[in-house]
Structure formats: structure tokens, C-alpha cells
């Protein structure tokens, strides 16, 4: 436990930021999983494209604001795009 008042404040701030970061990353995981579920279920391509766009939008936002590394955001976008393109060819 912190002994100084400033250390207590930093601990509180750190806990709040940690909770926010976890929530944002969880939202991203949910969006990516939703797209993958649609692909696995054989949903129509327009539905998969909507899920793809929302996941990419979230990835861009988190990458720009440094919640995840920009290269990781780019890599995930590329992976999702590859899944979407292969899904289009399979039909």
C-alpha cells in the first residue's frame, strides 16, 4: 500500500486507467469475434462487411490513441481483410 498521498492518488488513477484500457480492448475482441462468428456461420457477405468495417474502425481508433501499438492495429486489419477476401471468393 502507498505511504504518501501522491502515491495513493497515482494508484487510484492507475486503477481507473487500467479499467478503461481493459474495457476498450474487450470491445475490440468482441468485434473481431463477431466477424469471425459470422464467417464461420456462413452469413451473407454484406453482414460480414459491416462487422469488418466496425472492427477496423475500432482498431484504427485504438491504434491512433495508443491503446494498442499502431503496428498491431495494422496487422489485425490485414488479417481481417484477408479473412473477408477469402470469404468472398469461397461463395
From Swiss-Prot:
Gene3D superfamilies: Ribosomal protein S20 (1.20.58.110). Keywords: Ribonucleoprotein, Ribosomal protein, RNA-binding, rRNA-binding. One of its GO terms (biological process) is translation. Residues 1-25 are annotated as: Disordered. Residues 1-18 have a biased composition (Basic and acidic residues). Coiled coil: none annotated. Disulfide bonds: none annotated. The keyword Ribonucleoprotein applies. One of its GO terms (cellular component) is cytosol. GO terms for molecular function: small ribosomal subunit rRNA binding; structural constituent of ribosome. NCBIfam families: S20 (TIGR00029). Belongs to the bacterial ribosomal protein bS20 family. Binds directly to 16S ribosomal RNA. This is Small ribosomal subunit protein bS20.
Amino acid at each position: 500500500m502507498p505511504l504518501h498521498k501522491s502515491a495513493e492518488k497515482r494508484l487510484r488513477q492507475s486503477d481507473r486507467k487500467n479499467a478503461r484500457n481493459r474495457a476498450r480492448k474487450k470491445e475490440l475482441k468482441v468485434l473481431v469475434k463477431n466477424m469471425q462468428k459470422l464467417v464461420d456461420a456462413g452469413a451473407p457477405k454484406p453482414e460480414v462487411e459491416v462487422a469488418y468495417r466496425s472492427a477496423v474502425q475500432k482498431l484504427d481508433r485504438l491504434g491512433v490513441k495508443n491503446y494498442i501499438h499502431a503496428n498491431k492495429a495494422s496487422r489485425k486489419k490485414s488479417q481481417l481483410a484477408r479473412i473477408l477476401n477469402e470469404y468472398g471468393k469461397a461463395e
